């Protein structure tokens, strides 16, 4: 198609005339530049527009060219518009540089017949595609792909030979040339169509050249086989009752199967790995990419009649750890047989549970954890005369009825009724004066003159302890030693704080609940008994 030529006449429209002027003015100057460079000449171009505006171009210097023009007296060529028109008419209207009159583009009968023929061919092609796919569907454009694949969902019992005739046409006319090997081997998109009476399996939009169980698993077209189509024999009852399954299966990048697994475990492992992909569907196809499967042979008894697994079978599969084996990019390998592969039984994994260590909660919160896991809440340890009952389902707590703290000696008198077991029973023990006397064995009047390195004096004159590490924490004889004098010390003559009372009450509860906890603990959970080193690390 050549350029549209216009008639050389004055342009009446103001806007069109201005646009044409600017365009052709630049064209004339460009031609002058090309002529000056190519032919080594001097050019001076002077243009006055219709609005009396001056535009000039000079290849070198305009004044020098004009001076040279005025001083030139020899005969020379001088042309006007009349001379140009005469020259163009002499050369003919077919000259490449000469314009011609504008011709009207009318629709001739020949052109109209040509367009009608193109439309008819397009309609015939669309009708052939609809007849080839059985008339039940329309061509469907796959996203992110360079080819169009007609997909139909036939009604059960209404398909016939026309379904089988669709695959050669699809493989020859509707599929673009094969993509590069890097795109194919990296794991592309596979479209698996399961009609009610036949199975058409295509990977990356191309049919397999041979059986997938033998040789290379990479799909590709072959000279002799244009499609891979296998017919599954079914009873008339199963044909009417079974609906067609149409799925787009995207094989994920899976890791190789460990070498110590058997053939059924390989199938179950690959099925489970595919069920963990982003396709959330209750029907899972068993056309699964399984690496290193060519060395196994399956018999007729290894396959079930149905080719899908329900959601209960998927949920029964045990979860494998994702980091067992490294990931690798494998090509798609589909298992095609007269019947689909089976849904194998899951592999049971037993993990031995180690027993938990006994709880050791020595905080002065008034709550104690029993060996059976229930918590019994005791009364306030700082109250002078109170009874505490155990929490629901737990062991009983012990109340400190009479707690007396002396100024110069830390001695505790614990006595009163036993705690009532809540829920499951288990009452506490009665406190007596002997237990209180044992708590004050290590207490002495000179304790208050000792200082601890981690303490800092408070504003009231007390030494506020900084919690440190107690090497006797958690042992059975810890309650026999009483509270650690390094934890809470007062200056001589200073009144004792409430923390002494709480620590003494907790020590009584620890001592009285220790026999009850020892009876419930087994040989494995019981802590080790060691002889207490009373003299080590304690000041006198």
Swiss-Prot record:
Chain intervals with Low complexity compositional bias: 207-217, 370-389, 509-520
Location of Phosphoserine modifications: 95, 98
Start-end of Polar residues biased regions: 164-187, 231-241
Phenotype on disruption: RNAi-mediated knockdown in pupae results in smaller muscle founder templates that display a reduced number of nuclei. No effect on the initiation of myoblast fusion.
UniProt-listed Pfam families: HJURP_C (PF12347), SRF-TF (PF00319)
Feature: compositional bias, Gly residues: 416-430
Disordered, as annotated region: 162-191, 203-241, 332-396, 415-434, 507-540
Task of the protein: Transcription factor that could be a key player in early mesoderm differentiation and may be required for subsequent cell fate specifications within the somatic and visceral/heart mesodermal layers. Essential for myoblast fusion and consequently muscle formation in adults. During embryonic and pupal development, binds to the enhancer of the myoblast fusion gene sing and activates its transcription.
The protein's name in its UniProt record: Myocyte-specific enhancer factor 2
């Amino acid at each position: 198609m050549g350029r549209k030529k216009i008639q050389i006449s004055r342009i009446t429209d103001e806007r069109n005339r201005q646009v044409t002027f600017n365009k052709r003015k630049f064209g004339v100057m460009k031609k002058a530049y090309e002529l000056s460079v190519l032919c080594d000449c001097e050019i001076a171009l002077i243009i006055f527009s219709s609005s009396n505006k001056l535009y000039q171009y000079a290849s070198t210097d305009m004044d020098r060219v004009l001076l040279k023009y005025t001083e030139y007296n020899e005969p020379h060529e001088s042309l006007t518009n009349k001379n140009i028109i005469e020259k163009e008419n002499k050369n003919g209207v077919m000259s490449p540089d000469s314009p011609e009159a504008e011709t009207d583009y009318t629709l001739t009968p020949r052109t109209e017949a040509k367009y009608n023929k193109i439309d008819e061919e397009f309609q015939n092609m669309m009708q052939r595609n609809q007849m080839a796919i059985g008339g039940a569907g329309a061509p469907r454009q796959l996203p992110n792909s360079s080819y169009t694949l007609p997909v139909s969902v036939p009604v059960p019992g209404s398909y016939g030979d026309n379904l089988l005739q669709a695959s050669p046409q699809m493989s020859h006319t509707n599929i673009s040339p094969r993509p590069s090997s890097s795109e194919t081997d990296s794991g592309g998109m596979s479209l698996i169509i399961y009609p009610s009476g036949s199975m058409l399996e295509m990977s990356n939009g191309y049919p397999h050249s041979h059986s997938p169980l033998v040789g290379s698993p990479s799909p590709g077209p072959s000279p002799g086989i244009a499609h891979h189509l296998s017919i599954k024999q079914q009873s008339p009852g199963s044909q009417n009752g079974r609906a067609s399954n149409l799925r787009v299966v995207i094989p994920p990048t899976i890791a190789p199967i460990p070498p110590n697994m058997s053939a059924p475990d390989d199938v179950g492992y690959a099925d489970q790995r595919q069920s963990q992909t982003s396709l959330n569907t209750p029907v899972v196809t068993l056309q699964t990419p399984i690496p290193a499967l060519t060395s196994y042979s399956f018999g007729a008894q290894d396959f079930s009649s149905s080719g899908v697994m329900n959601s209960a079978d998927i949920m029964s599969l045990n979860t494998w750890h994702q980091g067992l084996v490294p990931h690798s990019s494998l090509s798609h390998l589909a298992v095609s047989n007269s019947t689909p592969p089976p849904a194998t039984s899951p592999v049971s994994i037993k993990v031995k549970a180690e027993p938990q260590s006994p709880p050791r909660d020595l905080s002065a919160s008034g709550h104690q954890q029993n060996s059976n896991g229930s918590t019994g809440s005791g009364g306030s340890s700082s109250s002078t005369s109170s009874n505490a009952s155990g929490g629901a389902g737990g062991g009983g707590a012990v109340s400190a009825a009479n707690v007396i703290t002396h100024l110069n000696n830390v001695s505790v008198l614990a006595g009163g009724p036993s705690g009532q077991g809540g829920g499951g029973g288990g009452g506490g023990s009665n406190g007596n004066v002997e237990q209180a006397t044992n708590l004050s064995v290590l207490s002495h009047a000179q304790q208050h003159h000792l200082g601890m390195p981690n303490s800092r004096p408070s504003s009231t004159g007390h030494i506020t302890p900084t919690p440190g590490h107690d090497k006797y924490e958690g042992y059975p004889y810890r309650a026999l030693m009483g509270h650690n004098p390094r934890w809470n010390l007062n200056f001589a003559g200073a009144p004792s704080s409430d923390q002494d009372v709480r620590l003494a009450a907790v020590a009584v509860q620890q001592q009285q609940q220790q026999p009850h906890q020892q009876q419930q603990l087994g040989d494995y959970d019981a802590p080790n008994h060691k002889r207490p080193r009373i003299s080590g690390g304690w000041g006198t």
